[in-house]
Each structure stands twice: as structure tokens, then as C-alpha cells.
Amino acid sequence: MRSNYIVIEGLEGAGKTTARNVVVDTLKELGIEQMVFTREPGGTQLAEKLRSLVLDIKSVGDEVIDVKAEVLMFYAARVQLVETVIKPALAEGQWVIGDRHDLSTQAYQGGGRGIDQQMLATLRNAVLGDFRPNLTLYLDVTPEVGLKRARARGELDRIEQESLDFFNRTRARYLELAAQDDSIRTIDATQSLEGVTRSIRETITAWLQEQQA
């Protein structure tokens, strides 16, 4: 079976870490052992420094990060990760399991921040070309539920401290994009842990069967 790039997406508190564990267990049960794990922003020395700049509320003191500067930092981190980690791993036959990818930018910056979608499309095409995940699992949860979970984890980062309206716009854009792309599968993340686990397993199994058809 050829290598694939699977990405897990969702709002803060959607349960991405739990979902990743389910994905890994499911793939291992199917005999897939060679996996590389990534997160965005991050995953390389350069990308991790950019992550700190864009997410740590103390990284630039009182300076306000312009929304366009923010999106450019996300893309700088992304291209470094894709070119130095993800593509080489896929070429070696390893599966890549990612915590966030470009869909986050389309939802958070395009939906939440309201950045022009044509600008984002131009950036995406310039940086990524036709590179896309083979499968994206979007964990759908209301902002109220997600933020409650996130707050329970401890201190929030710069984006996690955004308004409820911001996250409502972000979620709406996620759902809009998921409805337009067959490679994005929506998982109801408000279910019980058992329900989410079952949904992810069923989704991956069905997707793999589609690939082999």
C-alpha cells in the first residue's frame, strides 16, 4: 500500500490528539507501521521558532501582529515542513500523520480573520502547488464546547484567546470547505469518546477501501 498523508483538523478543544492516537492504532491494526508525525505550525527548527512567534502572546511584547504578517509566518513554517519533512517521508514510503495543515489557514485566517480568499488561494498555490493531504479528518465541535475543553488544559495561546465570534466564523468556514472537498471527512467531535473513536475507525476503513477499489 502506497504512503499517504493524513491530516487532523478542528477548532481548539476538538480532540485532535485523541484522534491522532485512534488513527495510529487503526493503521497499525492494518499492518501500517512506518509513520511520521507532524504539527503545524512547527515540525522543524525553523518552523518551531515561527510557531513561538505567532502563538506565544509574549513573543513580540505589546506589538500587534498584522493579520497578513501572521498568515505569511504560517506559510513560511508550512513550506519548510512540507519540503524538508513531509515530502521526503512520503517519498521513502512512510505515512505522515499531521496535526493541522493548510485547511487551518483557510478556516482561521480566511474565516476567522476575514482575509481575502483569493489572496489565500494565491499564497497556497505559490507555496504548495498541487500538494494536498490524501485525507483530512475534520473534528467538528461548537466553539463553546471546544474552548471550554481548551481552557481546562491551562493557559491559552494567542489565537486561542480570540473571541467567540472569531471561532464561529472559523467553524463556518471549516464546514463550508469540508462540504466542497471529498477528501475532507467530518467527524462529530461532540460525541462520547467511544463514538468519536468508532467514527474515525469507520471513516479510515471506508476511505482505504475506496483507495483500493
UniProtKB/Swiss-Prot annotation:
PROSITE patterns assigned: THYMIDYLATE_KINASE
Protein species of origin: Enterobacter sp. (strain 638)
Q: Which HAMAP family match?
A: Thymidylate_kinase
Q: What is this protein called?
A: Thymidylate kinase
InterPro entries membership: P-loop_NTPase, Thymidylate_kin-like_dom, Thymidylate_kin_CS, Thymidylate_kinase
GO molecular function (one): ATP binding
Q: What sort of enzyme, by top EC class, is this?
A: transferase
Q: Which UniProt keywords apply?
A: ATP-binding, Kinase, Nucleotide biosynthesis, Nucleotide-binding, Transferase
User: Family, per the entry?
Assistant: Belongs to the thymidylate kinase family.
One of its GO biological process terms is: dTDP biosynthetic process
EC assignment: the record states: 2.7.4.9
What the protein does comes down to: Phosphorylation of dTMP to form dTDP in both de novo and salvage pathways of dTTP synthesis.
Q: Which reaction does it catalyse?
A: dTMP + ATP = dTDP + ADP
A Gene Ontology term for the protein's cellular component: cytosol
Q: Does the keyword Repeat apply?
A: no
Q: Which domain of life is it from?
A: Bacteria
Q: Which of this chain's residues are annotated to bind ATP? A: G10, L11, E12, G13, A14, G15, K16, T17
